[in-house]
C-alpha cells in the first residue's frame, strides 16, 4: 500500500546523500560523522543517538541546535503526524526461575519505575519512563515527541517483534535496495522483496 511512499523517502535519501549513491554500498561511510561535520542537514536515526550527538566535542551539538521531525513521504494526512515510536524490546520474567528470584525481579522492576532513584536512572541513561511521577529526561528528541503528541499529532508505531524472521526478511529487502541504489535495479524488485518476502517468511513461521 505504501511502497510508492517508501520509494519517495528512499529516493530523497540517496539523491541528497553526502556521497554518490553508486558508492553507498561500498561501506566505510559514517552518517553521524557527516552530520557532526555539517556535511549533512538531516540524519535519520532515533532518540538513542542523543548522547552521542550532544556535548562540546567535535561533531557534537548543544541542546538548542538539535531537533527531530517526522518522516514525510506523501501519505495523506501526514501533516498531522508526530514522531515514529516503537521498540523491539520487552521485559520478561522467567516463570521457570526460582520463586525467590522471580519475586526479586518483580520487586526490582517495580522499584525502577516508581522510585525517585530508579526513574532518575531511567531518565538519564535510557530516556522516557511512561509511568506517573517519573523523571523527565533531558533528551530533546523526547521533548520533541511530547510536543507533537500534546498538539494532537498521531504516532506511527513500530515493533520488530512482529516481523516474521526479521533478519532473513530484512536481508532480502536490503539486497534489493542495494541493487536499486547502486546498480540501477528495478523498484519492482524492492516491492517483491518487501511484500512477497514478508509473505514467504510468515508462511515459514506460521505454516
Give the positions of each predicted feature.
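Short, solvent-exposed loop/beta-turn-alpha elements that line the ligand-binding surface or hinge
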Residues: 1-6, 57-61, 73-83, 133-143
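Extracytoplasmic/periplasmic substrate-recognition and gating elements
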Residues: 11, 16-19, 57-125
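Short helix-initiation/N-cap motifs at beta->coil->alpha
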Residues: 21-36
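Glycine-centered hinge/linker elements that transmit conformational signals in sensory
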Residues: 1-24
